[in-house]
């Protein structure tokens, strides 16, 4: 049984490629075998649903199809039943790669008949079982946490659900099970895991969806080392059992500070070098005014040395400058090192000693190129951090068959929000601070307080993040205070947590791994929509069901909700 992919009539013999999720089989209708089936087969069209019975036979020499696992056999049909007819599909299903994605998402039920997507979802199913089996073997409890919960700040906007029986009040769909898994630790369930559905109302990118799945775990009486080991063990098992790739452990580690200094990013791609080099001290002594001014104002000057990059054309350099400007750079200086010395519009501003010091600092050799960026720290790291990845792509420095994991640790507890003009949590407000830093810097320099947070990064993509949590009420209260929460706000938003912490909360910590992002790596796809059965668009819409959609006035009345007229205006 299956679907008709193609039908061919060769001089009275009808061939049909019958497709199901296992693959394609050729079925053959001959008048001398079954006149009734042969006559009925003449009416078969693409995507008709068929049931056949017959004899399996070897294909005759010359008709073998080596591209199919079933290419050496065919089924000589004795009986045929057309289980259902089909409208003509809006596009040729076998040609999906050349079809606009919006059309494919509108007809997702047809798109999912494609063998690539079916294989993707089967591997996803297999991976889910591997995850469950792994944590079961490690003595974890799989416990579901609520989907309808309280709105608490976790970094993104909440999806809100109005309560009909409590007019004017709202549930929120969980951005993560964070607080519930901490409460489970307080309740004595010392090893929790869940394949959790999470919801975040945020601007979407290629690797984000408004609803997603994360591998969520939490442990009592733990330290980061145990969580690292568990995570690494899962990655080893997952990659080996699904795509036969051996993952090297232990993963490399670096602090947040080291990651930003060397790679300009807290999610470094370590498959290639091109590290950032700080030359602020050398630049401040040269005669190039713009360098000196930046350093005098508290900024930095950093450089990237591109081995063999002296062959970049002027157009290449202009293109790279424009690319850096996307990330805030005002411009970019450069040096080419030839046999005769420096080729650069800024070479005249450096003494021989300064040139020698710079060459040694960045590792400049004959045939290389150095690119400079001078600005405040954030701009320099954003510009050069993204530029190193762009150069690696252009120069073919990335081995796409390589999987390089790295732990990034010791994140700042807070980051300053220019829009809110205040400090916000880098991860979430339940992350344990470095106690020495908390006592030392406190309210005077909160940006200097390190956290006990860690991310796991794969090939430049954050695939998970976690931390040791705050288990003491007094420390949690201090962190809330540093976030400028009042007593009333603490009680209304987190009163239940503070109460729980006062009843003997054990030390605990955990991590959440982005399952959909991991699947993107296993399947080598750049789009998260390729690993989810029914994904949303970048505007968080479902083209197939036309969600989100308007609802009846009666439904809104039941919920005591009125939609502003301005919200109903077309864009």
Language model features: what each stretch is:
Residues 1-571:
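Class II aminoacyl-tRNA synthetase catalytic cores and aaRS-like
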């Amino acid at each position: 049984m299956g679907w008709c992919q193609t039908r061919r009539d060769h001089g009275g013999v009808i061939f049909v490629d019958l497709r199901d999720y296992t693959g394609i089989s050729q079925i053959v209708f001959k008048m001398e075998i079954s006149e009734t089936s042969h006559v009925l087969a003449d009416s078969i069209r693409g995507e008709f649903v068929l049931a056949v019975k017959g004899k399996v036979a070897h294909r005759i020499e010359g008709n073998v199809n080596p591209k199919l696992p079933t290419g050496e056999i065919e089924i000589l049909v004795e009986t045929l039943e057309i289980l259902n007819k089909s409208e003509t599909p809006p596009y040729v299903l076998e040609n999906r790669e050349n079809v606009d994605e919006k059309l494919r998402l509108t007809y997702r039920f047809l798109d999912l008949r494609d063998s690539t997507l079916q294989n993707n979802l089967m591997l996803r199913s297999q991976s889910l079982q591997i995850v469950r089996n792994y944590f079961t073997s490690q003595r974890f409890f799989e416990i579901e946490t609520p989907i309808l919960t309280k709105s608490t700040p976790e970094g993104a906007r909440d999806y809100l659900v109005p309560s009909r029986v409590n007019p004017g009040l709202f549930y929120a769909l969980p951005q993560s099970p964070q607080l519930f898994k901490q409460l489970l630790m307080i309740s004595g369930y010392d090893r929790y895991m869940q394949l959790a559905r999470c919801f975040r109302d945020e601007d979407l990118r290629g690797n984000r969806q408004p609803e997603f799945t994360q591998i969520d775990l939490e442990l009592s009486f733990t330290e980061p080392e145990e969580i690292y080991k568990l995570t690494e063990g899962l990655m080893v098992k997952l990659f080996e059992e699904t795509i036969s790739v051996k993952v090297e452990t232990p993963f490399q580690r670096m602090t947040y500070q080291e990651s930003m200094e060397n790679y300009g990013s807290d999610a470094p791609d370590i498959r290639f070098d091109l590290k950032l080099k700080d030359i602020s001290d050398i630049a401040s002594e040269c005669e190039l005014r713009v360098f000196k001014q930046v350093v005098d104002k508290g900024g930095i000057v950093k450089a990237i040395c591109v081995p063999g990059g002296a062959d970049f054309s002027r157009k290449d350099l202009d293109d790279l400058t424009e690319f850096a400007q996307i990330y805030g750079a005002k411009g970019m200086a450069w040096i080419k090192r030839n046999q005769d010395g420096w080729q650069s519009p800024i070479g005249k501003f450096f003494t021989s000693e300064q040139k020698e010091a710079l060459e040694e600092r960045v590792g400049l050799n004959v045939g290389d190129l150095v690119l400079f960026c001078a600005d405040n720290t954030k701009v320099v790291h954003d510009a050069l951090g993204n530029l190193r990845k762009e150069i690696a792509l252009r120069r073919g420095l990335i081995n796409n068959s390589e999987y390089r994991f790295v732990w990034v640790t010791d994140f700042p507890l807070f980051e300053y929000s220019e829009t809110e003009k205040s400090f916000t949590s880098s991860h979430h407000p339940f992350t344990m601070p470095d106690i020495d830093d908390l006592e030392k810097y406190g309210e005077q320099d909160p940006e200097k307080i390190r956290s006990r947070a860690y991310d796991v990064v794969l090939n430049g993509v954050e695939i998970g993040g976690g931390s040791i949590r705050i288990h003491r009420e007094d420390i949690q209260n201090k962190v809330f205070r540093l976030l400028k929460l009042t007593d009333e706000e603490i009680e209304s938003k987190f009163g239940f947590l503070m109460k729980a912490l006062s009843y003997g909360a054990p030390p605990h910590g955990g991590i959440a791994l982005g399952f959909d992002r991991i699947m993107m790596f296993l399947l080598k796809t750049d789009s998260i929509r390729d690993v989810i059965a029914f994904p949303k668009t970048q505007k968080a819409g479902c083209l197939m069901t036309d969600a989100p959609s308007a609802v009846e006035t009666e439904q809104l009345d039941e919920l005591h909700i009125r939609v502003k007229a301005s919200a109903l205006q077309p864009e």
